[in-house]
């Protein structure tokens, strides 16, 4: 009985899941990272100044939340690659996973 109580308390006190960025490579031409975006998490405001390719390892619907609060849902299909241009000057957004599943993306950003 005590063991069960300790397990329950341990589960309740675990830190919430957070987005992680795992470096893949960095050279003169490009930098790459793997983004692991757990369910119901949100990044801080960010921007993309360079061209990039995004490969969906585990796809899903990622919500981009503009600094003005406007939401845009981007669907990433598992196994597909996507080309994205730099963001317009001054524009920023948050990445939000409002779904119940973790999304995993590899980003390759040109230098």
Feature roles, as predicted:
Residues 48-68:
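Glycine- and acidic-residue-biased ligand/ion/polar-headgroup-sensing regions
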Residues 59, 88-110:
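Ligand-binding loop in jelly-roll beta-barrel domains
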Residues 19-44, 49-55, 107-108:
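A short glycine-rich, His/Asp/Glu-containing loop-to-beta-strand
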Residues 35, 43-48, 65-66, 73-75, ...:
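Short histidine-centered beta-strand/loop micro-motifs
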Residues 40-44, 80-95:
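Histidine-centered metal-chelating micro-motifs
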Residues 26, 70-87:
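Short acidic-glycine-tyrosine-enriched beta hairpin
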Residues 14-17:
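Sec/Tat signal peptide C-region and signal peptidase I cleavage site
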Residues 1-8:
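Sec-dependent signal peptide recognition
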């Amino acid at each position: 009985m005590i063991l069960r109580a300790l397990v329950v308390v341990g589960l309740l006190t675990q830190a919430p899941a957070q987005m992680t960025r795992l470096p893949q490579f960095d050279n003169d031409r490009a930098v790459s990272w793997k983004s692991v975006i757990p369910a119901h998490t949100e990044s801080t405001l960010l921007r993309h100044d360079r061209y990039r390719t995004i490969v969906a390892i585990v796809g899903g619907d990622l919500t981009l939340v503009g600094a003005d609060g406007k939401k845009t849902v981007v669907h990433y299909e598992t196994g597909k690659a996507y080309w994205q241009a730099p963001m317009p000057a001054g524009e920023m957004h948050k990445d939000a996973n409002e779904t119940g599943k973790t999304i995993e993306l590899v980003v390759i950003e040109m230098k």
